[in-house]
Regions:
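Periplasmic/cell-envelope proteins involved in peptidoglycan metabolism and beta-lactam response
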Residues: 1-176, 186, 195, 268-276, ...
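Beta-lactam-recognizing serine transpeptidase/beta-lactamase-like catalytic domain environment
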Residues: 60, 154-199, 205-431, 456-457
Length: 457
């Protein structure tokens, strides 16, 4: 009897293990099968480590990449270069994470049929990018390193996300032997993976914080003598700006005024608003995640805190994330999260269609409206409306000091205040010098291309 009981327990244990294993397998199959199929080793989806199951087009239907058999890029050399960091190269040095993320959708994978496409034509992925805008940005950057990003802050569609340096995947240069520095960081998607010292574009963050938490800030004035001292240390401006308000301090990008504004806001509030606005958070969309920024004022002296509110100290921002912050201001405190893939089809079947997601409210409507008015004033009084082809641009420039004898990075961020062209943007030109002088001509060409594309849709 004891022997029978013992055997019954052993059989029961084996049965429990078997059932548990089956349940685990079924759970993994239901939740992870798509990832298994699109794993780079899958012969059903990949050819020689490259996804091989369809075509990728831009928003206008231009074929950017045919991956039905081998990798065939656009017939246009400029387009091949301007879209390289999203489509990847043949050897896998530059990944196409967003494309790979939807490989199963392109292949027509489902849990019942597996990888199956009755049409025999493969899938088609449509990106929100415009080849025309990408090429305009590439031309405007003129060989300089950096990134240009533009997205629709109402829908989330990314029209432009250019990274330079780049190269033609059909005419690959000898990068390993290059000693000129021309291709330094060429495999990096700067829009997603880079972080930059923001310089004065960060003053928008400080301005929004001051508007929200400093009583009567609109009645405050700040006097700039060219330097604002903290004992033996000081914050400096290129010239004495005299007496300024918050609005004119932003327009003149007055460091000394913002040092005084920083004192009114205070450390605790600055940390709070940086977190609330999300400007240093990573951002995820379409299977990609951006680099995290940095705002660290722990154990900092007053002068270092002042510089942090000016966009220096150890501040770092990611271009994609900061562009989204600009979009939230344009949207009255709520923006759209960006996305790159508009839709995916397998044969005649729509297997994926993007939907707009919002950032949630990051600031009040009143604060956003005030910041927007200030940024509009910047363009009207400093940068010049004539640069933007009749578009109502709101912006802030930045010249981020790098130290070590390096030339400053040029930054420019903002948005278009127009129902027909709801675009937020960021331009970064590495070692480009002054922000507005360098970036405005780039942005002017890119926004003109965006306008042309949107008018044609």
């Amino acid at each position: 009897m004891n022997r029978v009981t013992k055997r019954t327990w052993i059989m029961g244990l084996f049965l429990a293990v078997l059932l548990g294993g089956m349940m685990f397998f079924l759970w993994e199959y239901v939740t992870q099968a798509g990832d298994w199929v699109t794993f780079p080793g899958s012969p059903h989806v990949y050819n020689n480590a490259n996804i091989g199951c369809g075509t990728v087009t831009d928003r206008s239907g231009n074929v950017l990449l045919d991956i039905t058999e081998e990798r065939t890029y656009s017939s246009d050399a400029a387009t091949r270069q301007s879209t390289l960091h999203w489509l990847g190269d043949r050897k896998g040095y530059i990944s196409a994470s967003a494309v790979s993320h939807y490989a199963g959708k392109m292949a027509g994978f489902d849990l019942v049929s597996g990888v199956y496409d009755s049409s025999g034509e493969g899938g088609e992925m449509t990106l929100t990018l415009s080849a025309k805008v990408q090429n305009a940005a590439l031309d405007a950057m003129a060989g300089r390193k950096g990134t240009v990003g533009v997205y629709n802050y109402k829908t989330g569609e990314i029209l432009c996300a250019l990274t330079t340096p780049t190269y033609d995947p059909d005419n690959v240069p000898d990068i390993a032997s290059d000693t000129s520095g021309q291709y330094d960081g060429v495999y990096l998607n700067r829009f997603l993976q880079s972080t930059y010292v923001p310089g004065s574009i960060f003053k928008v963050v400080t301005t929004a914080a001051a508007l929200d938490c400093v009583p009567d800030i609109l009645d405050e004035t700040f006097t700039c003598y060219g330097a604002y001292e903290y004992g033996t240390e000081k914050v400096t401006c290129e010239k004495a700006h005299g007496t300024l308000t918050l609005k004119t301090a932003l327009a003149n990008s007055c460091n000394c005024s913002f040092a005084q504004i920083a004192e009114l806001v205070g450390k605790k509030n600055m940390v709070k608003y940086v977190e609330q606005f999300g400007v240093t958070d990573s951002l995820s969309f379409d299977g990609v995640t951006t680099a995290e920024g940095n705002y660290d004022i722990s154990n900092t002296a007053p002068v270092s805190f002042a510089w942090s509110c000016i966009g220096q100290h150890t501040d770092l921002i990611n271009p994609a994330r900061y562009m989204t912050f600009m979009g939230a201001i344009a949207g009255g405190g709520v923006g759209a999260e960006p996305y790159l893939v508009s839709e995916v089809r397998s044969g005649e079947e729509m297997t994926y269609e993007a939907k707009t997601k919002t950032t949630g409210r990051i600031m009040s409507q009143d604060v956003a409206d005030q910041v927007r008015a200030y940024m509009r004033n910047n363009v009207q009084s400093v940068y010049g409306d004539w640069n933007f082809n009749g578009m109502n641009v709101c912006a802030k420039s930045g010249t981020s000091q790098l130290g070590g004898g390096q030339k400053s990075n040029a930054m420019f961020a903002g948005f278009v205040e127009d129902e027909q062209y709801p675009l937020a943007f960021i331009v970064v030109v590495e070692n480009g010098g002054y922000g507005s002088a360098t970036c405005v001509p780039v942005l002017s060409k890119v926004l003109a291309a965006c306008k042309s594309v949107l008018d044609g849709e």
